[in-house]
Amino acid sequence: MPAFDLGLNRDGGLTHVIDKGLGPRAWEDVLETSGDYIDIVKLGWGTAYVTPNLERKLEVLKGKPVVLGGTFFEVVHSQGKLEEYKRWLGELGLTHVELSDGVIDLPRERKLELIEDFARDFIVLSEVGSKDAEAVFAPYQWVEWIKGELEAGAWKVITEGREGGTAGIYRPTGEMRTGLVDEIAHEVDVADLIFEAPSKGSQAWFVKQFGPAVNLGNIPPEEVIPLETLRLGLRADTLKEVLPGEDLPVS
């Protein structure tokens, strides 16, 4: 760290990191470098099920909320193993759980019941939106679903984007559905949302649109520090929007 102080400090905003299978030693390196900027770690989709050293990995991540991917919940639900899943989460010492319906056909009322049920024992992150890039829903539906899941007990609602930013709040080309996001934000407090933003372009857009304290998800481990610089205005993409003064030169 430099000997001088720019007066730049992180002021809120969750950074939700996606893990695709890093080992314990890799996570030790990640935490040593960027642990101060990581708020939640998601073990993507069903990777936890096939990770042989999962307990060791969770020990390294101790102190960080860890959640298993929502797709794994969908598999468990489809096989009627919800009670076994709850027990396993408890045995692993996990306090957070993600519930989604991005792939399976889960009736709306049933999803709300499950959120309410899991919220008795866990901190629930629910996810809204389909993983099917061709599935498009009207903004009012997103708003209705998000509000319903928050009322059912979800701590935060994740807006689907996939790890590649090609579904949900994104078009298949990767372009942001800005009108959809704006309408959601008009009706729902953005503090209750986690926007999936796996690319630098999407991260910068959210920081400029909603400020440095916006909650962002599906952040790759190697992108945690770059995202932090976007939040603090230490990167050209957000320098003018974040730092005081509107006429700062950008080189």
Each language-model region and where it sits:
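Conserved N-terminal beta1-alpha1 strand-loop-helix module at the mouth
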Residues: 1-60
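Catalytic cores of alpha/beta
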Residues: 29, 81-88, 137-151, 199-212
